[in-house]
């Protein structure tokens, strides 16, 4: 597959397709404790669940999914820690807040203790960081938004869509693909049906009833 293409996997049998999606969802959510899945990233086997974002139903895109928010807070933490001056400012500000709280806690008729250090990701969780979900935003625009998020929080991971082609016209799909390729986001879209002529940026893998794979 060329670097400027994204993967499209077509499964012919609906029953297999549903089972495949169900299994992928469990892998992404790390629910299959007995059957772990891996993905190859930079020639290394990496945990599938930690490196894949699976969009099962784009009509109900949840930008504040626990996994996404956790990835966003981790990204912000890494960025802040890598900037020594900003990180020092963060720690100093937190300690000032602790000092103010302790001025009141010390007056209580019993002993108390506080956490003197806190990670940035924990701090962001405490202030309830969320992605603003514009309900008036079109489904088309929301797909671009999730591509932005996926590319930011895990640029080497994979963003997986199910039935993406069912929701958009060919011209819209090509624009989505182009945006993902331009932003170097690895995208896999899973579809059900017969083989078809690839659109621009598509690299099609066709899977038959016996789960044999054929490239278009």
What residue spans do the PLM features occupy?
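Glycine-rich P-loop/Walker A and Walker A-like loops and their local beta1-loop-alpha1 context
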Residues: 1-81, 85, 170
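Flexible, charged surface loops at secondary-structure boundaries
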Residues: 1-4, 150-156, 181-182
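GG-anchored amphipathic helix commonly corresponding to the ABC/SMC/Rad50 NBD signature/C-loop
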Residues: 139-155
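Structural motif
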Residues: 10-15, 19, 161-166, 191-193
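Alpha-helical oligomerization segments
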Residues: 170-216
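Short acidic, S/G/P-rich loop/turn micro-motifs used as interaction or catalytic elements
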Residues: 15, 131-137, 163-169, 196
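Conserved P-loop NTPase "ATPase switch" module shared by AAA+ and STAND
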Residues: 151-169
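Conserved P-loop NTPase mechanochemical-coupling segment
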Residues: 96-138
């Amino acid at each position: 597959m060329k670097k400027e293409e994204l993967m499209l996997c077509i499964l012919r049998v609906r029953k297999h397709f549903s089972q495949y999606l169900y299994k992928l969802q469990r892998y992404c959510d790390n629910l299959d404790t007995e059957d772990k899945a891996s993905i190859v990233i930079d020639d290394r086997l990496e945990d599938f669940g930690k490196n894949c974002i699976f969009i099962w139903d784009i009509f109900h895109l949840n930008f504040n999914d626990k996994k996404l928010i956790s990835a966003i807070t981790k990204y912000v933490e890494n960025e802040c820690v890598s900037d020594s001056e900003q990180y020092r400012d963060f720690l100093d500000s937190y300690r000032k807040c602790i000092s103010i709280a302790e001025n009141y806690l010390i007056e209580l008729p019993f002993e108390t203790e506080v956490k003197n250090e806190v990670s940035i990701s924990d701090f962001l969780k405490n202030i309830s960081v969320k992605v603003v979900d514009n309900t008036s935003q079109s489904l088309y625009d929301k797909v671009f938004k999730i591509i932005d998020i996926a590319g930011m929080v895990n640029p080497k991971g994979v963003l997986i869509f199910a039935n993406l082609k069912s929701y958009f016209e060919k011209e819209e799909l090509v624009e989505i693909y182009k945006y993902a390729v331009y932003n170097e986001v690895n995208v896999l879209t899973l579809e059900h049906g017969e083989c078809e002529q690839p659109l621009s940026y598509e690299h099609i893998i066709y899977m038959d009833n016996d789960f044999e794979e054929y490239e278009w």
